[in-house]
């Protein structure tokens, strides 16, 4: 459908708040349990079937990117690469007589688990891109289950510690020359988009409903203004103070109503 554009496909990402009705996983703490890459590496037959399907669909094209969810160690990336290479060579052999070409896909990982924030240089040696999963990263950094009504009020992507972590990620990614994208609620919110632009993120993944609003907003501000706003946010002591700075700035730009409605 889009042979000239990169197509990113994520390997099976279930568990936690993404259950499969035909593959029930009963755990006392599912968010810290058997989910994402942990599950599929324990079941390489599932991983290989999915990767083979991705590769089959990409025969004759060169735009496939495979993304691994819930990575927490370098060894998980290494084992995933081994299995992807196995599938690649299997499919290559199967189509050898057809004259068709199979290109090796680019490989990326989701940055959702805090441990990987401290191993980005090591991980950069094994992958082609990073993608920050801000929703899960926020709940792990703040130790908050966002689906638990008793503590959901503590979940906030504008917590200064979360903003600091997101800033560190893009700085380290740039230092290691690895492209980085970010997805999650904050990327599709006007206030969040401004802060992320100030940090250095240039690829924001969001719901299609938010695209026009965010596109319109970023045309109304400069990068220098985003950086100044970020500086105030990073030195704040709470998310409430962050929002005070955001609202004050945006009111001066005549954009306060937009942010209050979308933040």
Label for each model-derived stretch:
Residues 1-263:
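Conserved alpha/beta-domain cores
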């Amino acid at each position: 459908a889009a042979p000239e554009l990169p197509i990113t496909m994520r390997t099976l990402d279930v568990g936690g708040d993404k259950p499969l009705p035909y593959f029930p996983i009963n755990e006392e703490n599912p968010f810290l349990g058997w989910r994402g890459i942990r599950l599929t590496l324990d079941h390489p037959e599932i991983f290989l079937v999915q990767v083979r399907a991705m590769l089959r669909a990409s025969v004759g094209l060169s735009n496939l990117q495979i993304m691994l969810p819930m990575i927490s160690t370098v060894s998980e990336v290494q084992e995933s690469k081994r299995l992807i290479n196995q599938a690649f060579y299997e499919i290559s052999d199967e189509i050898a007589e057809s004259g068709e070409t199979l290109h090796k896909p680019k490989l990326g990982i989701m940055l959702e688990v805090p441990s990987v924030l401290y191993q980005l240089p090591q991980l950069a040696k094994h992958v082609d891109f990073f993608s920050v999963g801000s929703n899960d990263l926020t709940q792990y950094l703040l130790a908050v289950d966002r689906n638990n009504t008793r503590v959901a009020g503590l979940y906030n992507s504008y917590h200064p510690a979360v903003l600091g972590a997101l800033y560190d990620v893009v700085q380290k990614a740039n230092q290691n020359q690895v492209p980085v994208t970010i997805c999650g609620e904050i990327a599709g919110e006007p206030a969040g988009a401004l802060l992320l632009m100030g940090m250095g993120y240039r690829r924001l993944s969001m719901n299609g409903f938010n695209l026009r609003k965010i596109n319109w907003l970023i045309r109304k501000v400069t990068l220098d203004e985003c950086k100044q706003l970020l500086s105030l946010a990073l030195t704040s002591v709470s998310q409430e103070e962050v929002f005070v700075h955001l609202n004050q700035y945006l009111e001066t730009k005549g954009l306060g109503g937009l942010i209050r409605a979308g933040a």
